[in-house]
Amino acid sequence: MRRVEEFSRRLREGRDPAHDFSHIQRIARLCRAIAPPGVDTELVVLAAYFHGALEREDEVRRFLEELGVKEEYACRVLEAVRDAESGRPESPEGKVLYDANVLDALGAVGIARSFTKSGYESQSIEETMRIIRENVERTVYTPRAREMADDRRRFMKYFLERLEMELRYAENRRGRAVE
């Protein structure tokens, strides 16, 4: 797995900080945590390391071949990535990977990632809040992901309410900063 991690880390170079290798590591761990019985967990975890790298699919295929991964299995790994990234996964593996990615966009980590990406792209607080609201509403498919998402969504809603309250307070103080 170390070679897979090293390869995945190289694939992430130059990405915005919200989509760096630590994002991939969290997704891989979440895949293990939420995969229901009957899902090939090892396949989904392997697919997690190639999440967001479909533009380099040929390179990923060659890497898997060098590792000795059978072509049929490599195709299933890449199909799970494709399915998850379609936004409407159909396969059990695609649903697990999709859900893990959604979970990483929820809760405290999701808020931190949203502001990190927005700062990187010079977006406003209001634009970041819009993105966070969109993330709160994303669907998850697996039972364990639904349980985990509920708590993370509650936290995000509380955070947004609090942030909106503080921003309104600041605006009501005649344009002066809140002290």
Please name every model-derived segment.
Residues 5, 21-28, 41, 45, ...:
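Short, well-structured alpha-helical segments
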Residues 40-60, 77-87:
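His-Asp-centered metal-binding catalytic motifs of divalent-metal-dependent phosphohydrolases/nucleases
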Residues 27, 32, 56-67:
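An active-site-proximal "capping" alpha-helix that borders the catalytic cofactor pocket
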Residues 1-10:
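Short alpha-helical hairpin
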Residues 71-74, 88-90:
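Short, structured loop/turn "capping" segments at alpha-beta junctions
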Residues 10-38, 50, 88-179:
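Divalent metal-dependent phosphate-bond-processing catalytic cores, especially two-metal-ion Mg2+/Mn2+ enzymes
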